[in-house]
Amino acid sequence: MYPAHLLVLLAVCVSLLGAASIPPLPLNLVQFSYVITCANHGRRSSLDYADYGCYCGAGGSGTPVDELDRCCQIHDDCYGEAEKQGCYPKMLIYDYYCGSDGPYCRNVKKKCNRMVCDCDVAAAKCFARNAYNNANYNIDTNKRCK
């Protein structure tokens, strides 16, 4: 084998090892982003909700900064209830329909999948109903979420 071929092979192996160490997003969070996009008809990226207020994104504490943040608090609580039932909300996927009036759960028969679908659809519709305040994106949660 030529030295150049060995270098290419080594580069491929190293890049594959690096890619293997990147944790994948839980499937449900990817699906939830599609449900959000369906509910707001593509007017706002689901990423805009990933770091909004005190509850949108990882974790959550304190008093929600507005109604949109309250949607996230309710969604967190909904996932908490699903976990109490033995479900793993961030790992479950479900079948939903994106109609002209927003997302709906479709033919979801398993209890846990149905609970998670209901949580996600309710949150996405709540996001679409409430105003997005740019001032509440990426806030200092240590100061504002007490």
Swiss-Prot record:
**Entry EC number(s):** 3.1.1.4
- Location(s) in or outside the cell: Secreted
List cystine links.
38-98, 54-145, 56-72, 71-126, 78-119, 87-112, 105-117
Alphabetical list of Gene3D superfamilies matching this protein = Phospholipase A2 domain
Give binding positions for Ca(2+).
55, 57, 59, 76
Active site (UniProt): 75, 120
Q: Which domain of life is it from?
A: Eukaryota
Show the catalytic activity.
Answer: a 1,2-diacyl-sn-glycero-3-phosphocholine + H2O = a 1-acyl-sn-glycero-3-phosphocholine + a fatty acid + H(+)
A single Gene Ontology CC term: extracellular region
| Residues making up the signal peptide according to the UniProt record | 1-21
Q: Which PROSITE patterns match?
A: PA2_ASP (PS00119), PA2_HIS (PS00118)
Q: Which UniProt keywords apply?
A: Calcium, Disulfide bond, Hydrolase, Lipid degradation, Lipid metabolism, Metal-binding, Neurotoxin, Presynaptic neurotoxin, Secreted, Signal, Toxin
Note how many cofactor molecules are bound and how.
Binds 1 Ca(2+) ion per subunit.
Similarity section: Belongs to the phospholipase A2 family. Group I subfamily. D49 sub-subfamily.
> What is the protein name stated in its UniProt record?
Basic phospholipase A2
Q: State the organism of origin.
A: Hydrophis hardwickii (Hardwick's spine-bellied seasnake)
